[in-house]
A protein has these predicted regions:
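Short alpha-helical transmembrane segments in multi-pass integral membrane proteins
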Residues: 1-17, 72-137, 183-235, 292-358, ...
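N-terminal transmembrane alpha-helices
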Residues: 2-39, 52-67, 71, 96-103, ...
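Transmembrane helical elements of multi-pass membrane transporters/channels
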Residues: 12-31, 133, 144, 167, ...
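Small-residue-rich hydrophobic transmembrane alpha-helices
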Residues: 44-104, 141-160, 266-330, 363-382
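Hydrophobic transmembrane alpha-helices of multi-pass small-molecule transporters
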Residues: 56-59, 171-175, 200-205, 275-279, ...
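Short runs within selected transmembrane alpha-helices of multi-pass transporters and secretion channels
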Residues: 65, 133-152, 160-171, 189-204, ...
Length: 436
């Protein structure tokens, strides 16, 4: 009976969160598709150059949201509602402060950021426009991530999913309207993206009006330990998102030297396509997180292990399905983002996908196990896994392998890195098994 209960709860949380994350990945793909159709290879290159800043904004939002919501879920399972509300208040304050910093950065420093990220020639103007608008919507991204995580951990994954899907599909519709009928170019693309968290927040506000939430704004004084607790748990989410931006930046630099802007556009096709699979893995991990944190809070080890087992099995099945889809439909997938029918871009994207996507089997496992460690307050293993796969191993691996095997070496760096980190993750789990 307990086993059925564990599986039922996991299926409910994970499936709803995966649906929401698929929606997010679809709007990222739609963004790339519409930009490719409307602005060609230069537009896709500008979009890819700006990704590190998006990763930073989304990463800090998840750091606050996941870190705060994990502590909130633990306190809630222990019946400590006042402590949970203090965590929420501190998280909200952090989101507002960081959002204001992003807004000011976008308003006054978008051009230096564009050039620092490697924008050159015809893509500088488009990258600057994209970054300016993206950063000025920073407060909404931070608040959306924070509220989404807290509401999901307060027992309402359905509303969390509804908000994510509504924001994502609104972005897809607005993308088309702004880029094509209204001919707003790259500004239209990022305006659609910026409005997405605004729309999502409108949906999430329903939760507050219903007055069913367990978290409230309270007077908070001398909350240094609360801030530390949020950051120590949430930094794993920040590193995950920020690392993806660092990897994109490093890969862009390497590929620019090997194959120019066309090579970067080919990498954009691969990176944006892989976002779908990674988003599903993240959805599984985030779906299991409230259950793991609550079980950890009351010391229910059977539930902890059951949720981890279901997460890993789900991840392996998804990885196999995605890889088979890539193997059989490589050409049409690459062609979707190659609106100018550039032969070299098509060839590089096809070759890269077949190699790059072998890493999914290991990356999914690493995402699941690092999230498991973070949700159960095992900070060192969680951060070590995330840092290794995020940039400490993959960036030098990409530089070394590109020297040895050119562009093929760049594509191989991802699966090789994820395999090594998966082996290390297993060692961490075995060493911590008696504590789990």
């Amino acid at each position: 009976m307990k086993k059925n209960s564990h599986l039922r709860d996991f299926a409910r949380y994970a499936s709803l969160n995966v649906l929401g994350m698929i929606g997010v990945s679809c709007y990222i793909l739609a963004d790339t598709f519409f930009v490719a159709k409307g602005m060609g290879a230069d537009g896709v290159t500008a979009l890819n150059i700006a990704i590190p800043i998006y990763s930073l904004i989304h990463g800090t939002g998840l750091m606050i949201g996941m870190g705060g919501a994990t502590k909130f879920a633990i306190y809630k399972s222990q019946g400590r509602d006042e402590a949970g509300s203090r965590v929420f208040t501190c998280a909200l304050l952090m989101a507002l402060v960081l959002g204001a910093i992003y807004f000011l950065g976008g308003a006054f420093f978008s051009m230096p950021f564009a050039k620092l990220l490697g924008a050159k020639g015809s893509v500088v103007g488009m990258t600057n426009t994209y970054l300016k608008v993206l950063m000025m919507f920073g407060p909404f991204f931070e608040l959306n991530d924070t509220f989404n995580c807290f509401i999901r951990n307060d027992g309402n994954p359905k509303l969390s999913m509804a908000a994510m899907l509504t924001g994502s599909f609104s972005n897809i519709i607005l993308d088309y309207v702004f880029i094509f009928p209204l001919d707003m170019g790259i500004f239209g693309a990022i305006l659609a993206t910026g409005l997405s968290p605004v729309i999502s927040l409108c949906i999430l506000s329903i939760y507050k009006f219903r007055k069913k939430n367990s978290f409230h704004i309270v007077r908070a004084r001398h909350e240094g330990r609360t801030f530390d607790g949020i950051l120590s748990i949430g930094v794993q989410s920040l590193i995950t998102e920020l690392s993806s931006g660092i990897v994109v930046l490093a890969f862009n630099i390497i590929i620019l030297g090997l194959a120019g802007n066309t090579g970067v556009a080919a990498y954009a096709v691969i990176a944006n396509t892989s976002i779908v699979a990674v988003s599903i893995f993240t959805g599984i991990a985030q779906g299991g997180q409230p259950l793991i944190s609550a079980a950890h809070g009351i010391g229910n080890k059977d539930r902890l292990r059951a949720v981890l087992r279901y997460s890993i099995i789900s991840q392996l099945v998804i990885a196999l399905m995605v890889y088979l889809a890539i193997a059989f439909f490589t050409t049409p997938i690459a062609a979707i983002f190659n609106s100018e029918h550039i032969d070299s871009l098509q060839r590089m994207a096809e070759d890269g996908m077949k190699i790059y996507f072998t890493g999914l089997f290991f990356s999914g496992f690493n995402i699941i196990i690092s999230a498991f460690f973070a949700a159960s307050e095992k900070i060192i293993p969680a951060q070590t896994i995330t840092i290794l796969r995020g940039f400490a191993l993959i960036v030098p691996m990409a530089f070394i392998m590109s020297k040895a095997a050119g562009l093929t070496g760049v594509w191989l760096a991802y699966p090789v890195t994820e395999f090594i980190v998966a082996a290390i993750s297993i060692i961490f789990y075995i060493r911590n098994r008696h504590k789990t």
